[in-house]
Amino acid sequence: MDEYIKKIKGNKNFIYLSLAFIFLIIAFINPKFTMKKDISNYIFVVDITQSMLTQDALLNGEKVSRLKYAKDISQKVLEQLPCKTKVSIGMFAGVSVAATYTPIEVCENFSAINETIERLDWRSVWAGNTRLRASMINLARLIRSFPESAQVVYFTDGEEAPKLHAFNTEDLNQFQGANNWLFVGIGSDEGTPIPKYDNKNQLIGYWSNESFALQPGVAQISAQNAGGRDNNVSNASYDRYLSRLDEKYLKSLAQEVKGNYVNGSDLKEILSAMKKQPSAWRDDTEVQLRNIFSFFALLFFIMQFFSINRVKSLLKIKYGKS
């Protein structure tokens, strides 16, 4: 018996093949265990006001509109989210945010969510002004109507129209409900004119500095100009209103509502900031070990064909004797 055991020990090929067979059997059994995993719910809010049509965002080496960039980066974020995460898509205009649906699971509904983002259009606006600050209260109210709580990822350039002053600045001192909301800044800090389009999405000029109806972010058809749209545009390049990503304001707003800000130019930074947002709930996730045991089965199967002496002889054949 001892001699038989010694014989087996000396036969490395038999040992490797046996181990490969054992691991293969275990892989077929597919042992599993469960572990707790944080699950997140989100609402991606995309600013669709006209200032988001400013072409100062860089995508694949060319300048595109802020809205197009916001849609692209939000789709890239969506691709990185793990299964069981739930996402809703919201649109911001005026003083409020409209959700297309309550948060739905990303893997089962990826195509639907992706298409929703793709179809976002500035012509869907329902109000003519852009009051980002005032939208905080309405957004918190919207989230409270969801079946489950959701974290906010807000894609915007920070443009307020009309500009904030003492009489129209919303008091957020008592505001609650925005903890850890993430503001993603879209655009650049170089002044760029805001294009003005007609209702067929044809360029007719640029927003001017003077005309109230053409203030940055004001939509063509709104409560301010219902009954007719002002087609006036800036008469000269010097008269064009220059729009910029207002990072200073977005950082200040984020701090005021106990949220966070990140520049939208870096996908990794956005994902990193999202990981810091608290999860909505914890779930039992099943972890399968089949792939691990299959790997070891393959490894030991391959090892039976190799030995140190065989490797040395192969090296000698290739490179010659040293």
Report each predicted region and the residues it spans.
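C-terminal signal-anchor/stop-transfer transmembrane helix together with its immediate cytosolic
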Residues: M1-K37, K276-S322
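Alpha-helical transmembrane signal-anchor/signal-peptide segments
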Residues: K32-Q50
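Juxtamembrane amphipathic/hinge helix adjacent to a transmembrane helix
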Residues: I43, L253-F293
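Second-shell loop/turn segments in exported
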Residues: A57-S65, A99-I104, L120-G128, A236-Y241
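Short beta-strand-loop
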Residues: K86-R119, L142-I143, A273
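VWA/integrin I-like adhesion module and closely mimicked acidic/polar interface patches used
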Residues: G158-L242
